[in-house]
Amino acid sequence: MATVQQKLITPVSQERSDASRNKVTVVGVGQVGMACAVSILLRELTDEIALVDVLEDKLKGEMMDLLHGSLFLKTPKIMANKDYGITANSRVVVVTAGARQQEGESRLNLVQRNVNIFKFIIPQIVKYSPNCTIIVVSNPVDILTYVTWKISGFPKNRVIGSGCNLDSARFRYLMAEKLGLHPSSCHGWVLGEHGDSSVPVWSGVNVAGVGLQQLNPDIGTAQDKENWKDVHKMVVESAYEVIKLKGYTNWAIGLSVAELTESMVKNLKRVHPVSTMVKGMYGIENEVFLSLPCVLSADGLIDVINQMLKDDEVAQLRKSAETLWNIQKELKDL
């Protein structure tokens, strides 16, 4: 006897199982992973999204919650499983999984614990999606992007870190607040390490092509009477403040990652400050990943924009690189 489906629908052709052209996987369904997933879904960037985690109940719950909202989304396939088989043929894989820093734990110890986690995750991604681009979001992001690059064996254009994309967004927001404008009209770059030693490029800060350093030669320095350097100080401190208030950060980084994903799945060739391998640039001699303005396309990271940095900005970048290398060179089993 025919089912309701058989009575309702007359098949015309066989569905192709490999029809997805822009599948995205998110590894880790914590606060950050889900913010990334929801931001990607709401921006309608993919026809297929896969979620992976070791916590099966949480994973199933998050998937069900999203599926119950399918009517309001335009992503026909939302899947979740602890088996990486469901991630097969992803174009972009977002890695948010990792250990959290415990009270009193050294950064090196945290990184080493994350190395051990990544040694399980990354080979699975490579196995099922050998042509994907990996966006590393887990912290400390610059070091874990290096770790991912080493473990994956991928070319450096297909392993990026979310890096200073968020730092720069925070910088532009705070700059906009000070000027009474929208962040999209305020241009400025934060480069280097995602975190305490990031480098604000005051020489390039502008609105409508008007360089703020031309209007205020002391901008960003200790001599500046308007205290613009506080803008960068707030960028560095903002994550700590949000964590103190709500326990974690997730929405801004989720939106930031969706923006990076869009540039790649739509082949936009937009420029973003993301973490890339900087050996050979600005006099940096070690294999470290730092944020520079990078062009993102369907092939991953295809170009780096050579900014005309001032000597003190280059010195800060090199110092960032040295700090990271001192941790990386101590890592075991890479």
UniProtKB/Swiss-Prot annotation:
Keywords: Cytoplasm, NAD, Oxidoreductase. NAD(+) binds at residues 30-58, 100, 139. It catalyses: (S)-lactate + NAD(+) = pyruvate + NADH + H(+). Substrate binds at residues 107, 139, 170, 249. It comes from Squalus acanthias. Its EC number is 1.1.1.27. This is L-lactate dehydrogenase B chain. It is found in: Cytoplasm.
